[in-house]
């Protein structure tokens, strides 16, 4: 789950990490009231969407007067915004964050994440903040510093001071940096986060460090014990189909292709998409119906797939270990009848009760195309979509 900037800053402040004073607003008048409550300007007005790159998209404005604040908020609120991080998708701007604006002396970068390669919580820091860290890594990798955290020792003050001196900070600033790192470690672990990125972590004209922007990503598997974080979820920022899928506890991700996929198991689902591409097709989605799939779940999966008008064919690829192939077949038949599927459907079944499942499909009288294996199924659905065009 992702968070808005204002939510991230609330969490940072809760853990003693300094952030500029700010208030969120839903109308231009609320934005003016927020600015007045923060004291004398200047202020920053920032569109709240689940994406970075807002500045280049017109979503971050420097304002010297409250009239400027009102105009900036009016221009952002109620619109939709796309950035280089949204892959062309426009996200609604329902809120703006109004903050105090200080003069930036230096921008740094700091993040903490789970490094699957080293199997540790890892800090990444750079003296080049305010830009994409991938760009820094490609152009000036020597400016990036990392720390793999020992789970027994955790993060200590000397780790932060060492980082701070590598980034060219003064002794006072290195001490502040150390405090931020230690507090960030507590936040990361106590809130079950998968990523915290502060970019920029800035030195302002008062000589102190402040988190000017924050990007958080939580571990969805820990949602059951993070009710306060779940309450922060903004479904308006998410793909509507993915929201419905999450409520049905179906793993679904929208993609750009035209071949819908219904598969059980994440690994098999990824392999299915790969084989479709190898055969010249483009998957329209990732959909893992799960090992505990039943007839109703299959029907709901079909509805999810066909909610996209881009889908021109469906490949069902099931390996019946826990799930029974005959039950999947019953679900497919019911789904085709209930949803009114008008695109080609290719089905590959293997595993428990596979012959019973295949017989049900044959006896259904429906134009369901059988496949012997994953490659055969991918070839058949790609060909069927081409022929139906």
Swiss-Prot record:
Cofactor: Mg(2+)
Gene3D superfamilies referenced in this protein's UniProt entry, alphabetically: ATP-grasp fold, A domain (3.30.1490.20), ATP-grasp fold, B domain (3.30.470.20), Succinyl-CoA synthetase domains (3.40.50.261)
EC number: 6.2.1.5
Details of cofactor binding: Binds 1 Mg(2+) ion per subunit.
Span of domain ATP-grasp: 9-244
Pfam families the record matches: ATP-grasp_2, Ligase_CoA
UniProt record, GO biological process: succinyl-CoA metabolic process; tricarboxylic acid cycle
Catalytic activity: succinate + ATP + CoA = succinyl-CoA + ADP + phosphate; GTP + succinate + CoA = succinyl-CoA + GDP + phosphate
GO CC, one annotated term: succinate-CoA ligase complex
Recorded superkingdom: Bacteria
InterPro entries given in the database record: ATP-grasp (IPR011761), ATP-grasp_succ-CoA_synth-type (IPR013650), ATP_grasp_subdomain_1 (IPR013815), Succ-CoA_synthase_bsu_CS (IPR017866), SUCC_ACL_C (IPR005811), Succ_CoA_ligase-like_bsu (IPR005809), Succinyl-CoA_synth-like (IPR016102)
Residues bound to ATP: 46, 53-55, 102, 107
Residues annotated to bind Mg(2+): 199, 213
Pathway(s) of this molecule: Carbohydrate metabolism; tricarboxylic acid cycle; succinate from succinyl-CoA (ligase route): step 1/1
Chain positions recorded as substrate binding sites: 264, 321-323
Keywords carried by this UniProt record: ATP-binding, Ligase, Magnesium, Metal-binding, Nucleotide-binding, Tricarboxylic acid cycle
GO MF term list: ATP binding; magnesium ion binding; succinate-CoA ligase (ADP-forming) activity; succinate-CoA ligase (GDP-forming) activity
Role: Succinyl-CoA synthetase functions in the citric acid cycle (TCA), coupling the hydrolysis of succinyl-CoA to the synthesis of either ATP or GTP and thus represents the only step of substrate-level phosphorylation in the TCA. The beta subunit provides nucleotide specificity of the enzyme and binds the substrate succinate, while the binding sites for coenzyme A and phosphate are found in the alpha subunit.
Subunit text: Heterotetramer of two alpha and two beta subunits.
Protein family: Belongs to the succinate/malate CoA ligase beta subunit family.
Protein name per its UniProtKB record: Succinate--CoA ligase [ADP-forming] subunit beta
Gene: sucC
């Amino acid at each position: 789950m992702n968070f808005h900037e204002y939510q991230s800053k609330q969490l940072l402040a809760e853990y003693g990490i300094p952030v500029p004073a700010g208030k969120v607003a839903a109308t231009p008048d609320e934005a003016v009231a927020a600015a007045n409550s923060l004291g004398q300007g200047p202020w920053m007005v920032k569109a709240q969407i689940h994406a970075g790159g807002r500045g280049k998209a017109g979503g971050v404005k420097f304002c010297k007067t409250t009239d400027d604040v009102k105009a900036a908020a009016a221009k952002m609120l109620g619109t939709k915004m796309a950035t280089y991080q949204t892959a062309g998708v426009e996200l609604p701007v329902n809120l703006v964050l109004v903050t105090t604006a200080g003069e930036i002396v230096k921008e740094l970068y700091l993040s903490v994440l789970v490094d699957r390669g080293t199997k540790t919580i890892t800090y990444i820091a750079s003296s080049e903040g305010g830009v994409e860290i991938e760009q820094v890594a490609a152009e000036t990798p020597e400016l990036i510093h990392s720390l793999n955290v020992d789970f027994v020792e955790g993060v200590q003050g000397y780790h932060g001071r060492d980082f701070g001196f590598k980034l060219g900070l003064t002794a006072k600033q290195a001490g502040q940096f150390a405090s931020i790192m230690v507090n960030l470690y507590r936040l990361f672990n106590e809130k079950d986060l998968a990523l915290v990125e502060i970019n920029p972590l800035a030195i302002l004209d008062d000589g102190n460090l402040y988190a000017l922007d924050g990007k958080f990503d939580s571990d969805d598997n820990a949602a059951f014990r993070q009710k306060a974080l779940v309450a922060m979820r903004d479904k308006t920022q998410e793909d509507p189909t993915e929201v419905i899928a999450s409520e049905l506890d179906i793993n679904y991700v929208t993609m750009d292709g035209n071949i819908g996929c219904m598969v059980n198991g994440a690994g098999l689902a990824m392999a299915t998409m790969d084989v479709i591409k190898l055969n010249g097709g483009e998957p329209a989605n990732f959909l893992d119906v799960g090992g505990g799939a039943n007839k109703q779940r299959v029907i709901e999966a079909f509805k999810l797939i066909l909610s996209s008008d881009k889908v021109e064919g469906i490949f069902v690829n099931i390996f019946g270990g826990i799930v029974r192939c005959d039950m999947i077949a019953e679900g497919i038949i019911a789904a085709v009848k209930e949803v009114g599927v008008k695109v080609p459907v290719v089905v590959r079944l293997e595993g428990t009760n596979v012959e019973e499942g295949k017989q049900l499909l044959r006896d259904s009288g429906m134009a369901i195309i059988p496949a012997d294996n994953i490659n055969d199924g991918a070839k058949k659905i790609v060909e069927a979509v081409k022929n139906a065009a």
